[in-house]
Design a protein with these regions (language model features):
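ABC-family P-loop ATPase nucleotide-binding domain
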Residues: 1-25, 268-274
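The feature captures the beta-strand-to-loop junction immediately N-terminal to the Walker
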Residues: 50-52
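Helix-to-loop junction immediately C-terminal to a conserved catalytic motif
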Residues: 65
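Conserved ABC ATPase "signature" region
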Residues: 126-159, 207-210
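Catalytic Walker B motif of ABC-type/P-loop ATPase nucleotide-binding domains
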Residues: 188-192
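A short, surface-exposed alpha-helical micro-motif characterized by mixed small hydrophobic
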Residues: 229-231
Length: 274
């Protein structure tokens, strides 16, 4: 137990760690967004990263994906230290991160979006892909059948030639998952994959994420919906004020609900999914 009375943040997960952070920090204009976060992501499991707004969740995901450097601390993928590696090097180790549709990806068709995913996973930057349209054409020759199959599975086949920016919010979430599957990662980082979608689509996306786990993918997802965490996540990391407040299963965190609620206020109710 930690001095906070919750589960020890440094406690090793039951399985081998696919990802590990040791004391990472990141400050912006002297204010710490992440302040000594330490945790492990169990291999082959779905882990939820939860906490109130401003807890440092997105900053942690940015650091893990190589989109941002940490100021101090260490990061590992398996046994390989990847502290402050650029994103293209981290991608080559099998890590893929979904993100909100950028202006550049929004200008591509739905099919082209899927075709960029293997290029990203191979370490190509988006800028390089856009400057070399022949790369997407090559991917279409080699992988169009697989991409169209995925679009059919995710209900986006009829939108294959539409610009991604024209999709609805829910369709964009499905496209993010389809891109991730197309990339065939070992580790997947999801930033609020079910935010702003209706309950029926939440259930569908949850099923797709469980399918990824069944295929051997390790998933780390930022999630605010504790019902979703209860239904599909194996492990939970709670961040508060840039620190790891607690780790474990949601059932374990409920045993410390009073302490957790004292730090998280009404933003996250650990009993909400009970």
């Amino acid at each position: 137990m930690s001095e906070l009375g919750v589960l020890d943040p440094a406690r090793p997960a039951a399985r081998a760690a696919a990802l590990r952070c040791d004391g990472i920090t990141k400050a912006f204009q002297g204010v710490h967004a992440v302040n000594g976060a330490t945790f492990e992501i169990p291999d082959g499991q779905i882990t939820a990263l939860i906490g109130p707004n401003g807890a440092g969740k997105t900053t942690v995901v940015n650091i893990l994906s190589g989109a941002m450097n940490c100021d101090s601390g260490r990061e590992f993928i398996g046994e390989t230290e990847v502290t402050n590696w650029p994103s293209h090097r981290i991608a080559r180790l099998g890590l893929f991160r979904t993100f909100q549709l950028s202006r550049e990806l929004g200008g591509l068709t739905v099919l082209e979006n899927l075709l960029t995913a293997p290029l990203h996973q191979a370490g190509e930057s988006l800028v390089n892909v856009l400057l070399r349209p022949g790369l997407i054409a090559r991917e279409e020759r080699e992988h169009a059948e697989r991409a169209l199959e995925l679009l059919d599975i995710y209900g986006l086949y009829h939108l294959r030639d539409a610009r991604a920016r024209e999709l609805s919010g829910g369709q964009k979430k499905l496209l993010e998952i389809a891109r991730a599957v197309m990339a065939a990662p070992k580790i997947l980082l999801l930033d609020e994959p079910m935010a702003g979608v209706n309950p029926a689509l939440i259930e569908r996306i949850g099923g797709y994420i469980l399918d990824l786990k069944q295929s051997g993918v390790t998933v780390l997802m930022i999630e605010h919906n504790l019902n979703v965490v209860e239904q599909i996540c194996d492990y939970v990391i709670v961040l508060a004020e840039g620190r790891t407040l607690a780790t474990g299963r949601l059932s374990e965190l409920r045993e410390n609900a009073e302490v957790v609620r004292a730090y998280l206020g009404e933003v996250i109710d650990v009993d909400a999914a009970h």
